[in-house]
Amino acid sequence: MVKKVLLCFMLGVATISSGCGKQVSSEKSNVVDMLESDDSEVKDTFPDTYNAESESGKVKFNCTLELPENMNTRTIQKTTVEGVHSYDKDKAYSLLAEGKEISNKEQYDGDNGEIISYTFSDGASLYLDYNITWTSATSSLYAYLGVQQSDYIDLFSSDSVSLDKDKYISEIKKDMNELGYDTENLSFQAIPLSVDAMKKLRDQELNNGLLEKGKTNEPTSEDEAYFIYAYQENTGIPVFHELMSVAKQMSNDSPDNAPVQAIYSARGLESLTIDYIYNFKNEQNTVTLKPFDEIASVVEEKYDNILNDVNYEVTRAKLYERVYTGEDQKYAEEPIWYFEVMENGSNKTVMLVNAETGKEINLPS
């Protein structure tokens, strides 16, 4: 049972923050005790924030719910997954590698058609399957440093670069549109990769033995870049793509799990990966999601019943549309709540709950 539940509904223009515990700006705020309120309008919506504590004190919620901005009801559109979006391989080659000297080319049949792999004389490479992977001749520095790893987000996000982020995002959108992707359904973000931050990371990895001396040169001003990434959205809800359901350690909502990832420097496009972008079809019916307090009780019960001395704090709650392969080996989808839970304020775990049925989704270890 929840001992105390405060549901904060924001009146006026509100902006959804990107994580739990962060303030949501508004013109006015009302606090509603949902345990005492029987207002049908309140029950048909989701709270902006959720703060609760179990009777034992073992489990606490401190969340700003991450929802589509225009979502004002618990009813959503039912959709089906038609498959992974296809693109023109010849167009991709022309766009990314036209004029380059090919040093090696391999072609073979794959599960989703022909696979073509190119290596170019300048060190660049292009891999074309159902996905696209491009790396330039100067991209090795970023790969060796692992700048896209989620562990380094704080290091890079706290710095800045003298580059035009919006220009680079527009360039990537333009390229993707030419390949036939609908970028209107992609939510783009960018993280600056400054020289100082890359030098600091390089020194750390050298000192920790994670990087061989002489493997990479010291970053220079020419290496300044943006790490740009995007998640797909369907009816405004972000898509939890199939790779994120392969195993628990793959389920994090982080930049390095995004289906679109690119590094853009003043030299141009350093790397690009486009993967797991789906075609969806709207159905005639809708789906009604469970009230959030019922979903929260599933999370509370799980962690409250663990026999240990650990305290758990739920710091993120984000609505996703999960795409996965069903028992019939066909694509399926379901609305889910993605929770990040901190153990004693340090170790993070992820819990997924079906937003329609309230059942936990257990991923392989």
What are the language-model segments listed below?
Residues 88, 164, 290-294, 354:
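Helix N-cap and loop-to-helix transition residues
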Residues 171, 175-341:
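Segments that shape or occlude catalytic/ligand-binding pockets
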Residues 1-5, 11:
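Positively charged n-region of N-terminal signal peptides that target proteins for export
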Residues 132-156, 160, 255-288, 351-365:
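A short, surface-exposed interaction/processing loop segment used at functional sites
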Residues 325-365:
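A cross-kingdom marker for long, charged
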Residues 16-19:
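C-terminal motif of bacterial Sec signal peptides marking the signal peptidase cleavage site
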Residues 21-251:
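Preferential activation on post-signal-peptide N-terminal prodomains/segments
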Residues 81, 256-258, 346-347:
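Short, small/polar residue-rich loop motifs at catalytic or cofactor-binding pockets
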